[in-house]
């Protein structure tokens, strides 16, 4: 055996010794409790407990019911119906019956000192607890009745309708059409069809009794809650008239109850009011995250629900701001007739209507009459010089042209091909200078002209600097001209012309006297 196995064995011995010591000290009740815990966990019964306890003494109902439920019913159902049997609920019901027959007087002093105000707050708080209790008992009934009709929980979703259906059917699923007249005919038809093919088994009599009692408790809690809500709605308009005028009596009562009073509600900032009651709506199955987001009771108010979904977020924000003001006004007993709440609600409704208005259409404006008059263009020496500088040259014009039926020459420039157009085509050896309009031609000043003329008179043989020794021919292109060669050609041509002349061939006689008169 390894060291790890020895350590585990020692720990097991210590645990067994501790359990046996505790069992000996507590007596047979501890063994019974250990048996119940093992039954709840579903781990079976240990051999030691099998020897010490007689399994046949455990009732059949405790074996068929869940262990938690069996233990609670063994205590005379006190743990299951704690709220229904509580003195707090009875006191609130008695208080509501007492004040229901009297007319509520306007509160003049501190609102926290009024007894009926505290009764209203407690009534609204216990109404929320009743919702939790109904949901808990509803889950319990579904767990019990699942063995008899497992498909029923998916066919009837409402807690009160489900309990009425279970109380009407119990173990007898035949003739369900005549027993379920309170349900829609389509639902009754589906239940009757499903009951014929259900895989459930009949429940024992004790289980049926417990299920029936639990359904009756749910119905009774629903009736008590309805009484409390009617009382709160009848009194909330007197306690908080402005708040009730803004969001209604039901939402006002829920907000006051969850905030812990009207004074505490007035201390809430407007940005936190939409989240009040979110957990409550989720618990009772009303809240839908896809629709309501992080909103609570304020989202379920009438003024918000009647607005389209796309503007509800803005409606909640505007309503929350007015609710915060109305709660603070009601806590100091201002505007007891609710005039502020009425005006605030009208203002919110007016703003919502403004949000729902379609966007205003822009009027169709005719196009302006085109101005065909000649535009004024800038002139002057600087503008003319700039135009001449950036004017398109003859070379660029030739490059932009392509001769018909001739291949265009191309050159490569930085990995790009550039066409030359008609540049370099045969028969095109002329280059025309850029034509300049005489009207806009840049002219020299008179002083500069006189200076150039005087320079030309002083040195008439001086070259102007514009002469060139280059010539362009259609055969060889650009040629370099030799001035000496041109002069020699002229001399040769002159000699050739006068070489055959008569006058140039007459020989002079040396014997002839130079002067005939001599």
Curated annotation (Swiss-Prot):
Ranges for domain Nop: 239-357
BP GO annotations: mRNA cis splicing, via spliceosome; mRNA splicing, via spliceosome; spliceosomal tri-snRNP complex assembly
Q: Which Pfam families match?
A: Nop, Prp31_C
What Gene3D superfamilies does its record include?
Answer: 1.10.287.4070, Nop domain (1.10.246.90)
- Which molecular function GO terms apply here? RNA binding
Q: Which domain of life is it from?
A: Eukaryota
Which residues, by range, are in coiled-coil regions?
A: 112-147, 205-239
Cellular location(s): Nucleus
Q: Which SMART domains match?
A: NOSIC
Task performed by this protein: Required for spliceosome assembly where it is needed to link the U4/U6XU5 tri-snRNP to the prespliceosome complexes.
**Family membership noted in the UniProt record:** Belongs to the PRP31 family.
Protein name listed in UniProt: Pre-mRNA-processing factor 31
Q: Which organism is it from?
A: Schizosaccharomyces pombe (strain 972 / ATCC 24843)
Q: What is the lineage of its organism?
A: Eukaryota, Fungi, Dikarya, Ascomycota, Taphrinomycotina
